[in-house]
Amino acid sequence: MKHSVHEDKSDYFSNHTPAGKETRLPEDCVKPTRETCLPEDCVNPTRETCLPKDCVKPLLETRFVKVFDLQYEDGKHYYDATRHSSGDIAATKNEAAFSEMFPDAVSCVVILCLPNREPLLLFSYEYRYTVGRYLLSVPAGLIDPKDKESSTRDEALINTAVRELREETGIEIKSEDKVTVINPCLFSTPGMTDESNALVCAVVHTDNLHELSQKGAVGSEKFDGFALFTKEEAAAVLRNGVDPNGHFYSVYTLAALLYFVADLWK
């Protein structure tokens, strides 16, 4: 745990300012702020700084990815790679819409409970085209529009998780299993994209690991087997910072390892 150290600087300026020296900043050194694209009604004491939709300019639009120029300030450009239309990106949402937004996808922390064995954390090796390798990955998938028709956001996220587990692992969720939402919306890399994932935990009771299957992969999905870790083995992957193949892994794999090792699923 990190502890903040607060230095008492109450006498700093009095002790370091020459006697009689004017310390106030001259008025001619104060420059007016640049005119921005944000209207006054979009900046309030709650720090709501939603971007007006007319300040979002399209640069690239493909089936799966779009890139927009977010013009918060004249002459400055911030680029957002997103799955959303210009009117639905996170930057344009007010506080109410932002707090209720759906993530793009669901990532699953999957823990297998077997008779007379310690629990195991389940991963797959999935090919990730942007890094050109099979990475240690959690089961995950995009939320379908039909999922959003559920009565609550959590229900929609759980429905997505159940479907993805079936497709990517062959696991069928049963009544004795437990599927819960850990976090409804996590940003992956907010410095360049508003892509987001929910994190869902599935505690699955099984007595047959041979039922695991990746035959349900769809589209461009490519898998190369599973990885099962005990708590001790998962902790070793955390300490090493790479998977057993020596490859780095995603932040969602890191989250799954931490959640499992810390026993937060119990």
Task: Pin down the residues of each PLM region.
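Phosphate-/nucleic-acid-contacting segments
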Residues: A217-V237
